Amino acid sequence: YAHQRFKNRLVCQRTDGGLTAALDPSLRRIGGTWIAWGSGEADREAVDSTDAVAVPPECPAYRLRRVWLSSDEVRGAYRGYANQVLWPLCHITLDRVAYRKSYWQHYVAMNRRFLETVLDELRRRPGQAVWTHDFHLALLPGMIKRVHPATVVSVFWHVPWPGPEVFRILPERRELLEGLLAADTLGFQTVSYAHAFAECARDILEAAISPVHEQAGLPLPVAQGELFAASGVCAACHMNMVDDSGGDVSIDSAWR
């Protein structure tokens, strides 16, 4: 959701995108908090004292909690490291990778911004589970676990995962893998992507991943895509997380 000014009125619009189309119906049914970057021109006007707003406007069902990013973080983390480094690398279009060391610094800073908001939500509503999404927040699971090791953290990776021969060209390959492996469950779109991630963990971190864990997602966080069906957003899985912990926080790296 994005808030805009139209003829002196504050207007809330549901944004397009696969993640919104998948998650919004689930959150309408079960409630929770969606933490997302606030990039709408009037998003700051719409929030309360906790930087949150109830959505959808016509029938509020869950909270949308905003994270405010600086212009440097948007350029360096979102447009830079996420979209010019990780996205083309994961799609193995290496000629499109535009790496700058400063991008990584901003990427770390953006993940810390989201961490601050997650920790505030966990203070306000202890015992919630956290579900993070996509390549913009690969460091966040590890950051959360260092502060709240008992918090259930799950991840769904919405793009391909390359094999170790490609992924190892990243200078920050270890940090990214360690951040993701801190999660309790890690889901991919296909079984082959899960296998590729497992190979990277073995090759780069020398991690021990058994075939059972790699296939079933137990307890090491490598799961088949079927466990987190992207098209249906796995309402059942999301419900299980809520039932286990008494609440949930759904984190989208940014997208409203």
Residue ranges of each PLM-predicted region?
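Catalytic cores of carbohydrate-active enzymes across secretory and cytosolic contexts
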Residues: 1-256
